[in-house]
Curated annotation (Swiss-Prot):
Source species: Homo sapiens
Keyword entries, A-Z: Cell cycle, Cell division, Cytoplasm, Cytoplasmic vesicle, Cytoskeleton, Nucleus, Phosphoprotein
Name assigned to this protein: IST1 homolog
Region of interest (Interaction with CHMP1A and CHMP1B), residue spans: 1-168
GO biological process: cell division; collateral sprouting; cytoskeleton-dependent cytokinesis; ESCRT III complex disassembly; establishment of protein localization; midbody abscission; multivesicular body assembly; positive regulation of collateral sprouting
Family that this chain belongs to: Belongs to the IST1 family.
Gene, per the UniProt record: IST1
Coiled-coil regions, chain positions: none
Length: 364
């Protein structure tokens, strides 16, 4: 089945180009659809309901095309993520069968929008044979995505979907609109009439995969009334039962003792701890012991020779300290010595007297 014209690097490059081209087209078509909705609101305000219905069919067709491009973008991304399988395996991997067949089926229908998609389909046919490509284009192989085939079909959208689009557009732009009662009466029971169906209603009701086909998110399966059952709460541990590790269940060891047990030593006893703490002497008891004679004291006393050699220290009594008496200041002048002149005895040097008086005070 290995084709002769397959080039792995060319397939890789064109897959990336297809992804970029699809993103640009999705953004462009979404913006154009938003502008077209304003035009439809103007038709409804002017009372041109039939004209508005025709324009809504164009918008639905563009929305379908955008959703189909999103599916193809996801498939191209999947092939790039698993490109190693494409290179290493000669046969087609079962996880890539839907992606490969869907890209080959969509290539002739979208090659006018995305030219690189045809190159991708040709490389896949060269890898897995032209016969496989023919089976994919006619969906005889049965692995083409059903949602993508529905989005790219040429059938007209259902009337109930057109009415829902008109109701939603009128509500967004505050335009009065009365939906067709005959069409609304044909709506299937159990489906909300004000919900816009963009192709995901059946998938959600069936609990199938989300946007992007296989590998998407799977919705939880609900009950017959559409409700989703609540999960069972986790069991909470009892507050009264303490946690403990289970004992190991292994062979006996260590002289027949099972694992996880402890045996005390038979000849070793723990020390006895007294019930009350020991008593200590108080300060009063210490002072009372000072009056006990030295004969009652147990133990060697100090040697008398050592105590005799100790110098006696005078008692420090600063309160009874008495200063020595100072001599009184003389009131009379000293007598003049013999041979001194009368003028000398009359001249008294008071500075000399003060100096000598200060010296006497210092000596005493």
């Amino acid at each position: 089945m290995l084709g002769s014209g397959f080039k792995a690097e060319r397939l890789r490059v064109n897959l990336r180009l297809v992804i970029n081209r699809l993103k640009l087209l999705e953004k462009k078509k979404t913006e154009l659809a938003q502008k077209a909705r304003k035009e439809i609101a103007d038709y409804l305000a002017a009372g041109k309901d039939e004209r508005a219905r025709i324009r809504v069919e164009h918008i639905i067709r563009e929305d379908y095309l955008v959703e189909a491009m999103e599916i193809l973008e996801l498939y191209c991304d999947l092939l790039l993520a698993r490109f190693g399988l494409i290179q290493s395996m000669k046969e087609l991997d079962s996880g890539l069968a839907e992606s490969v067949s869907t890209l080959i089926w969509a290539a002739p229908r979208l090659q006018s929008e995305v030219a690189e998609l045809k190159i991708v389909a040709d490389q896949l046919c060269a890898k897995y044979s032209k016969e496989y490509g023919k089976l994919c284009r006619t969906n005889q192989i049965g692995t083409v995505n059903d949602r993508l085939m529905h989005k790219l079909s040429v059938e007209a959208p259902p009337k109930i979907l057109v009415e829902r689009y008109l109701i939603e557009i009128a509500k967004n732009y505050n335009v009065p609109y009365e939906p067709d009662s005959v069409v609304m009466a044909e709506a299937p029971p159990g489906v909300e009439t004000d919900l816009i169906d963009v192709g995901f209603t059946d998938d959600v009701k069936k609990g199938g995969p989300g946007r992007g086909g296989s590998g998407g998110f799977t919705a939880p399966v609900g009950g017959p009334d559409g409700t989703v059952p609540m999960p069972m709460p986790m069991p909470m541990p009892s507050a009264n039962t303490p946690f403990s590790y289970p004992l190991p269940k292994g062979p006996s060891d260590f002289n027949g003792l099972p694992m996880g047990t402890y045996q005390a030593f038979p000849n070793i006893h723990p020390p006895q701890i007294p019930a009350t703490p020991p008593s200590y002497e108080s300060v009063d008891d210490i002072n009372a012991d000072k009056n006990i004679s030295s004969a009652q004291i147990v133990g060697p006393g100090p040697k008398p020779e050592a105590s005799a050699k100790l110098p006696s220290r005078p008692a420090d009594n600063y309160d009874n300290f008495v200063l020595p008496e100072l001599p009184s200041v003389p009131d009379t002048l000293p007598t003049a010595s013999a041979g001194a002149s009368t003028s000398a005895s009359e001249d008294i040097d008071f500075d000399d007297l003060s100096r000598r008086f200060e010296e006497l005070k210092k000596k005493t």
